[in-house]
């Protein structure tokens, strides 16, 4: 049985071609790539070794085994552990809406669906919001005000 995770990789935009090639070479043909503008304060950027600039964000659904291979490659080939190169991390997923979308997202990865269980109580949840251009300040104000 396999657990699935959302892998998030944030890097500079000039690394687009390198990361696309890397993900395909490591058996990850399905990923979302989008541009981003950070809202983190400078202390947070310093902690993760990021600079204030326009960023590139890659999102992919990976299994635990795929993440192990990718993590090694991100360090040895992409040098993601070097400050200023970027950051990559995974977030466990508790649910994916439907069998077909799940099969598409884990395309070419070895995956055996686990038995369905009830949602677990957790200390934190990640909420992903997609907003139209010009509304980022409104969304971030609401997120910061949430308790």
Model-identified regions with their sequence ranges:
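Positively charged, small/polar-rich N-terminal and surface patches that mediate targeting and assembly
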Residues: 1-147
